[in-house]
Amino acid sequence: MYKKVYVETTNNCNLNCDFCIHNERPKKFMNIDEFKTVLEKLKNHTKYLYLHVLGEPLIHPNINKFINIASSSFNVNLTTNGYLIKRIKENKNIRQINISLQSFDEKYQKSLQDYMNDIFLSVENLKNTAYISYRIWVKNKYTEEILNILSEKYNIMIDETKSKNITLEKNVFLSFNEEFTWPDLKNKEACKTGKCYALKDHIGILVDGTVVPCCLDSKGTIKLGNIFKSNIEDIINGKRYQNMLKGFSNNKKCEELCKKCNFIK
């Protein structure tokens, strides 16, 4: 059983951030029947769904329906850039919401204070039934301003040099991360050796049903199968899947994309 499965309900996004990898796949929204098919095939394979890979999940017109349907059998988690968080502020069927504060930029014609205030208003509702995790990069150009706003809101001194994970109040947390580079075949090779939690711990399902090893295969480079055409068991027993598993168990990266990934140690 997987610890979690990433399900991309859409690869559309309301932003165009410099740090995000460019989406080269056809833009699509998963429909309700497709989503139900994914859920049915994931039963007995995981208890935790993460409704994101590429794109902004809250842009999906049926996001609340998806959350409510999935919550009957799974613990639902999602990551959002925060701009559309009002759309789920009344939803009580979410286990955890990760808010990527590094997504803020003045080019989106909204002030930082207004952006944060909108998030705070929604978090006041959501924190009663969900864990809230603010995520921010240590060296983002707005980090200092954002931390000042958070510090004032939660009446707490925030020092990222002392702790990378801070409890702001009950069910509300702040995590610091370093900016990462999306693995891409165009990137310089990082290393040919290494082990990874992909396939053992988790898999990803793209909006068109393509099954990939992890949430960082945003382009669907390593196609292991398609959830709409095959069962999970058949995909797991597939040659490419098994070759990757065997490689990782021997500290070897079999796929070219994995060799370009800095997350694999």
Pin down the residues of each PLM region.
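Radical SAM enzyme [4Fe-4S]-AdoMet core and its adjacent flexible, acidic
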Residues: 30, 48-50, 90-235, 239-250, ...
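Alpha-helix boundary/interfacial micro-motifs
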Residues: 27-28, 70-72, 78, 119, ...
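Conserved alpha-helical substructure of the radical SAM core
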Residues: 1-96, 108-113
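Generic alpha-helical structural signal
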Residues: 36, 64, 117-120, 233, ...
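Short, flexible loop/turn elements at secondary-structure junctions
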Residues: 55, 80-82, 103, 138, ...
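N-terminal pre-core extensions flanking Radical SAM catalytic domains
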Residues: 1-26, 40, 189, 215, ...
